[in-house]
C-alpha cells in the first residue's frame, strides 16, 4: 500500500489531495482551483485568503465519513475539468484527507480511465483513501452512471 501523502505532493490527473491544514503554497503557479469539502477548512481558508492570492474556490460541504450527492459530485467534477483542461491543477481537501477527499480522487481517476480507481488512489496517495463501504459504493455507482 502507498504511504499517506497529505501535503499536496501527489497529483492524480491534475488533482492534488491535501488534508487540513496543508496547502501546497509552493505550487501556486500550477494551482487553478481549490475544492473544500469541510466547513473547518472553509473557515481557515477565509483567514488565509487575505494573503494576496486569488484562487477560485468551490465549497461543497460533505459530512465527515459521508458521500456527496450525485449533483454535488457533478459540480466538483465540472470544476476540476474546467481547471485541468486549462492547464491548471486543483487542490481537493477535507480534514483528514482520507474519506471525502479519497472519494473525489477515486472518481476523478475512474473518469480518467483507471480501471480500479479506489485501489489506484490507495496506492498512489494514501492507503486509507475512501474510508467507508458507503464511499466505495458511491464511487462505483457514480462511475457506472457517468462512464
Curated annotation (Swiss-Prot):
Pfam families: Tc-R-P (PF22785). InterPro entries: Prot-tyrosine_phosphatase-like, PTP, Tyr_Pase_dom. The keyword Protein transport does not apply. GO terms for molecular function: protein tyrosine phosphatase activity. Keywords: Plasmid. The keyword Nucleotide-binding does not apply. To M.jannaschii MJ0215. This is Uncharacterized protein MJECL20. It comes from Methanocaldococcus jannaschii (strain ATCC 43067 / DSM 2661 / JAL-1 / JCM 10045 / NBRC 100440). The lineage of its organism: Archaea, Methanobacteriati, Methanobacteriota, Methanomada group, Methanococci.
